[in-house]
Amino acid sequence: MTNLRKTHPLMKIINHAFIDLPAPSNISAWWNFGSLLGICLIIQMLTGLFLAMHYTSDTLTAFSSVAHICRDVNYGWLIRNMHANGASMFFMCLFIHVGRGIYYGSYMYKETWNIGVILLLTVMATAFVGYVLPWGQMSFWGATVITNLLSAIPYIGTTLVEWIWGGFSVDKATLTRFFAFHFILPFIVTALVIVHLLFLHETGSNNPTGLNPDSDKIPFHPYYTIKDTLGFIMMILALLLLTMFSPDMLGDPDNFSPANPLNTPPHIKPEWYFLFAYAILRSIPNKLGGVLALLASILILLIIPLLHTSKQRSLMFRPISQTLFWLLTSDLLILTWIGGQPVEQPFIIIGQIASITYFLIIIAFMPMAGLFENYMLKPKW
């Protein structure tokens, strides 16, 4: 009798995706982050569902409903803090996942890569609307500042902002629709994840060498299921440690105060995972220019496959490009730091230099290094 998992219409799909999937024998721990992102998404959807049972999306009661969840609901404090810090874990895994894709040339699978970029944008949108829901000071002013950026769009900008707000300021209508968006977007993310996996399984996984691994494949189960399980345990442990011991470490103290439209916080800033983009936005003194740079900082990922000049796919054997990659990583850390600082010298000039460097490394230096490394491969005798 043939095994049920190989014949049953539903089990067959799961089997081909997670059990009998041929995987390269040499993929490292950097390949764990895709499955970790899956776990993050599941954790966020489950904790979010339980939070939605007790949350009210009304300006008068939103803040107190979050306080009620933390004080009166059984394990509400745990669910709320896991959801808030789970978002940080999600973005940590996302950034590593994208970084691994750039380092090992996974962007050469263009469909998988492009859907991944769309996924990144969708998750960022989900996190942004979710940040507004507790209706604290930074929630309110963050929503006001970021949505207001759309007013930089010529001609239709102001109308567009008022349409999104549902009025002439961020108010009850805005909060209600943001809750609706925050509820629906994770399901859209889940659908995109399935498409992302569909395209990935068309080509098979890349591997650290960037060479064709077809000659040496192993089944996903048990080798990578056990490897992924170790990743799950480590990530969930890290999340629980953060949640139990310092749940407010990554949050903003201003969010302990209810939203007050009459009182602006001295420094408006988003959560840590948006600070790099926020720093790029602020480094350009023109409003429309800043918005375009903000968009470009993420959308530039879409043109990375077009900028690949090297004869080798991976950076594993390319020391010059490796150096540039780690310079880019350092540059993003500098931008993250600058995004959290007030708009004054020397932070302004540091932010401007870091922003220019970010775009230069991706658009100019990496392709040039690829061409130079090609030249170095040629025998010189």
UniProtKB/Swiss-Prot annotation:
Belongs to the cytochrome b family. A ubiquinone binds at H201. Coiled coil: none annotated. The keyword Transport applies. Its cofactor is heme b. Its main location: mitochondrion. GO terms for cellular component: mitochondrial inner membrane; respiratory chain complex III. The cytochrome bc1 complex contains 11 subunits: 3 respiratory subunits (MT-CYB, CYC1 and UQCRFS1), 2 core proteins (UQCRC1 and UQCRC2) and 6 low-molecular weight proteins (UQCRH/QCR6, UQCRB/QCR7, UQCRQ/QCR8, UQCR10/QCR9, UQCR11/QCR10 and a cleavage product of UQCRFS1). This cytochrome bc1 complex then forms a dimer. Component of the ubiquinol-cytochrome c reductase complex (complex III or cytochrome b-c1 complex) that is part of the mitochondrial respiratory chain. The b-c1 complex mediates electron transfer from ubiquinol to cytochrome c. Contributes to the generation of a proton gradient across the mitochondrial membrane that is then used for ATP synthesis. InterPro entries: Cyt_b/b6_C, Cyt_b/b6_C_sf, Cyt_b/b6_N, Cytb/b6-like_sf, Cytochrome_b, Cytochrome_b_C_euk/bac, Cytochrome_b_N_euk/bac, Di-haem_cyt_TM. Signal peptide: none annotated. GO terms for biological process: mitochondrial electron transport, ubiquinol to cytochrome c. This is Cytochrome b. Binds 2 heme b groups non-covalently. Heme 1 (or BL or b562) is low-potential and absorbs at about 562 nm, and heme 2 (or BH or b566) is high-potential and absorbs at about 566 nm. Keywords: Electron transport, Heme, Iron, Membrane, Metal-binding, Mitochondrion, Mitochondrion inner membrane, Respiratory chain, Transmembrane, Transmembrane helix, Transport, Ubiquinone. PROSITE patterns: CYTB_CTER, CYTB_NTER. Heme b b566 binds at H97, H196. Heme b b562 binds at H83, H182.
